[in-house]
Amino acid sequence: MTAAPPSPQQIRDRLLQAIDPQSNIRNMVAVQEVISSLEKYPITKEALEETRLGKLINDVRKKTKNEELAKRAKKLLRSWQKLIEPVHQNEAALRGLAGAPGSANGGAHNCRPEAGAAGPPKSVHDLKYRNDMPRLCGQRLDRLGSRKRRGDQRDLGHPGPPPKVSKASHDSLVPNSSPLPTNGISGSPESFPSPLDSSGHVGPEGNRLEHGENDKHSGKIPVNAVRPHTSSPGLGKPPGPCLQTKAVVLQQLDKVDETPGPPHPKGPPRCSLGSRNSRHEGSFARQRSPYTYKGSLPSPSPRPQSLDATQVPSPLPLAQPSTPPVRRLELLPSAESPVRWLEQPEGHQRLAGLGCKAGLPPAEPLLPRAGFSPDSSKADSDAASSGGSDSKKKKRYRPRDYTVNLDGQVAEAGVKPVRLKERKLTFDPMTRQIKPLTQKEPVRADSPVHTEQPRTELDKPEAKASLQSPFEQTNWKELSRNEIIQSYLSRQSSLLSSSGAQTPGAHHFMSEYLKQEESTRRGARKPHVLVPHGPPTDFPGLSREVTRDDLDKIQAHQWPGVNGCQDTQGNWYDWTQCISLDPHGDDGRLNILPYVCLD
């Protein structure tokens, strides 16, 4: 009688006895016996998972120097890998192979994993996986897409059941199709029948039910495979006509696959046809969509309209600017009322116009309301929409050109600012101030006084030159600290000294003024130092005995030079405090740390 073959657990124990904890072989004969017994033993996937024999054999293969033993171990591991792979191939296809070639070309949608290719464990796992998939994808919109696809194929009529294939041809098909998927999902294409298909066909209805189950099982991949790119024009439309054309092409492909011949080489042409079909589908969607979804942009041409609509709150884009009422509606909500706009001075109109960043001249809605002819405003609006970089510059400085003369006539459109001699005020874009254009013209009587307020201090002395001299009015203290003034004065003094001029210039007066100012400032500020005290005459402990009064004085009273010191501002510091002084009176701080004595 022959002894019963050892169990996988016994084989594992024998292998562990023949190697050390670092997987180095201690007993070569025992390891070779273990590998030969494993080569003959019909091991199952569950036994491999329980005993972890795959990891042990792989570690031995890496550590051994016997090439024959390493080759046998590698061959054994590959046979075990084929045993494990078909079970996990569906999960790997759904997780990691979604971006593989063929999965995004529309051909992945009619693939079904091959049931029964790996024996009973795989079929049980497959049924459990199919039952779990609808729950996983229940909250996604992909089921809606599979229903639509099922409905389209039901309307078109699904191709009938394919003819049965002999067992030998099916056996030759399974090893070719299962390890090498042709379109991104493991398993064979649907047109090649599996044992379940060839065993009993229920007609077109049963085939349709199987196809719906296939859609549920494939989960996300069919919808992702036929979903167009986000930049495609027909993104928001239901994919009805595209799927109809896809179903027609797939029906033709199924007919092609039914012809006899070697089954495996048809995989790559099928994938290329699927990719061609997806490209045809995108162009078909473009031809079939004269109107587009609300959120998508069919072509670059309407894009400027949408951008302009965000800037100009009017129902018409900027390409049709010859309607002044639309422009008038734009400025009225921001303005208080048209009458008060007319009462304000021109300078404020220009300031408000420059504040509008939309590039529309603010004086356009005012001129027709004031009784002037609206034709000039129309012409100006047409000129404003001329486009290009020149139009941007014109828009930026456009409010200068819209000024009303004292006579009540409108200035012509397109006139350069240099030719407008009648203006009282002008806006300086560099200083962002409103300044008078010429000093000779008299001030208008109807203009309010507060238009003079935005001027700087340097402009006010020019207006009051008749009352005070600029020398008395100017704040020389502020000017002396200006770096530009100081650099200018130093350059002037160097020029004067090099030319040998004897006349004192502005730099002489400025330097004299600065010297005088500095002397008065130093005289006003006193230095902050410690109070000096004379040499001590009484030395307790040296010249006489230490008394109780000395102890009380050093503990409870301030004794300069003994338990602390005093500064000129009346602050007392003991020897544990930091002292901060200003010995020169020039804001320079001298910080004395504790336990430091200065002579």
Curated annotation (Swiss-Prot):
SMART domains assigned to the protein according to its UniProt record, in alphabetical order: TFS2N
Composition bias type Polar residues, residue spans: 174-191
Family, as annotated: Belongs to the Mediator complex subunit 26 family.
Gene this chain is encoded by: MED26
InterPro entries: MED26, Med26_C, Med26_Mid, TFIIS/CRSP70_N_sub, TFIIS/LEDGF_dom_sf, TFIIS_N
Keyword Nucleus tagged: yes
Residue positions, PTM Phosphoserine: S447, S469
SUPFAM superfamilies: Conserved domain common to transcription factors TFIIS, elongin A, CRSP70 (SSF47676)
Name of the protein this chain belongs to: Mediator of RNA polymerase II transcription subunit 26
